């Protein structure tokens, strides 16, 4: 996501050996719109609520053709352009789930990942967490007799399924 690519850029620029893991298949985090319920993403009409001038990275301005309040497509393109411009793709392992990070007695980190149903364990001297904390919904249990449809915002992708319905 956006925090991960800036961390990769800044750490690699000072000469550190960087390895990143991303559950998605490309750079963009939640800004990659996808209708699959398993994918945490923005919904189809999302625009950022801050202006592009306040939201851009200081070393990589938005294209002048981008809307003042960019859409999710414009943001995804921006983050992918940033990653290409600074050659960050080489550091990222896509389609990889970070399952566990454990600090060891020698202050190193044991990181367990999974890619294509294959688990891998590696040890690192340092750990930077730029996790997508919105990827797995937290659904509280409510007491009562509600018999309607209950969905988490994680599954909300577009408004059309709710047309002519009463929604709370």
Where are these regions (language model features)?
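Short aromatic-enriched loop/helix-cap "lid" or pocket-rim segments at secondary-structure transitions
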Residues: 30-34, 106, 140
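Feature captures the FAD/FMN-dependent oxidoreductase FAD-binding
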Residues: 65-135
């Amino acid at each position: 996501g956006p925090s991960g690519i800036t961390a990769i850029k800044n750490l690699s620029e000072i000469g550190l050996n960087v390895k990143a893991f991303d559950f998605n298949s490309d750079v963009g985090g939640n800004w990659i719109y996808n209708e699959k319920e398993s994918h945490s993403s923005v919904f189809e009409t999302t625009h950022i609520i801050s202006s592009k001038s306040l939201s851009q990275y200081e070393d990589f301005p938005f294209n002048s053709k981008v809307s003042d309040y960019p859409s999710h497509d414009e943001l995804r393109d921006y983050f992918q352009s940033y990653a290409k411009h600074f050659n960050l793709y080489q550091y990222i392992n896509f389609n990889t789930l970070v399952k566990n990070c454990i600090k060891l007695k020698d202050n190193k980190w044991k990181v367990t990942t999974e890619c294509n149903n294959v688990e891998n364990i590696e040890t690192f001297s340092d750990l930077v967490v730029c996790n997508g904390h919105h990827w797995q919904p937290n659904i509280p249990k409510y007491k009562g007799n509600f018999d309607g449809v209950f969905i988490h915002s994680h599954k909300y992708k577009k408004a059309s399924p709710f047309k002519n319905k009463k929604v709370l």
